[in-house]
Amino acid sequence: MKDYLVKALAFNGEVRAYSVRTTNTVSEAQKRHDTWRTASAALGRSLTAGTMMGAMLKGEQKLTIKVEGNGPIGPILVDAHANGDVRGYVTNPHVDFEGTEQGKLRVYQAVGTEGFVTVIKDIGMREPFIGQSPIVSGELGEDFTYYFAVSEQTPSSVGVGVLVNGDDSVLAAGGFILQIMPGAQEETISFIEERLQQIPPVSQLIEQGLSPEELLYEVLGEDKVKVLETMDVQFNCTCSRERIESVLISLGKAELEQIRAEEEETEVHCHFCNERHKFAKEDITSLIEKL
């Protein structure tokens, strides 16, 4: 099954909802970065949340999420675009903790329970929107829920999950974001709160084969949900040899000549996708000739 995202309304517009399957997306990230189990869960949850938050944007808009906790995994960075493209990495991919709690990996031990979630939105204005909130649990779903409440004043529930096999491969990943609209009735809010207490973990529902639509039906009730739009999502990095050439050219002639004199081969590493772009002396020479 391919990865895709659903945008919906529920309870006659009282609730805005997003749901996504990110199994292939998170699996691609796991393979590229060789993340171990707990690191895979942390990165996967962040990618899943970022994918849905990116889908809240329009056109060429994009956002960057930075999760900086005090755990051994180090900072997590995610870039997400309005078109469904997402990329991301963890600073220390080889982090794992044995055992589980309530059937889930101990993500909070990897992320840490102190620190900040920062979201930078590039929405085409002169200055980006920057929102920040403290980490409240390190489990990430709760941390993004708190971010929406504190930084965007939007009562929300963020559920994100990743199931990882013993060989570190990704079995299932996905999530949902529910946002309460102004004027929502107390009965609606109470119903959602009760349902969220009753449903199994998101990753288990996706492993069972539930689609993004069915995930929303499970939480909100099929008769309450009106699907507005679906869109494909995927791990896709914006780095390319051409873009890196532009960056190298921007260094200027003097610095490029110094690089050519000192290095037999220049390697540029993209942290987001882990690709390594190599430039031989003659490649640097051709760049200098363009100046």
From Swiss-Prot:
One MF annotation (Gene Ontology) recorded for this entry: unfolded protein binding
Broad class of the protein's primary localization: cytoplasm
Domain of life: Bacteria
GO CC, any one term: cytoplasm
GO biological process: protein refolding
Record-annotated disulphide pairs: 237-239, 270-273
Localisation per UniProt entry: Cytoplasm
Alphabetized InterPro entries for the sequence: Heat_shock_Hsp33, Heat_shock_Hsp33_C, Heat_shock_Hsp33_N
PTM characteristics: Under oxidizing conditions two disulfide bonds are formed involving the reactive cysteines. Under reducing conditions zinc is bound to the reactive cysteines and the protein is inactive.
Keywords, alphabetical: Chaperone, Cytoplasm, Disulfide bond, Redox-active center, Zinc
PANTHER family the UniProt entry points to: 33 KDA CHAPERONIN (PTHR30111:SF1)
Family: Belongs to the HSP33 family.
Function: Redox regulated molecular chaperone. Protects both thermally unfolding and oxidatively damaged proteins from irreversible aggregation. Plays an important role in the bacterial defense system toward oxidative stress.
UniProt-recorded name of the protein: 33 kDa chaperonin
Gene for this chain: hslO
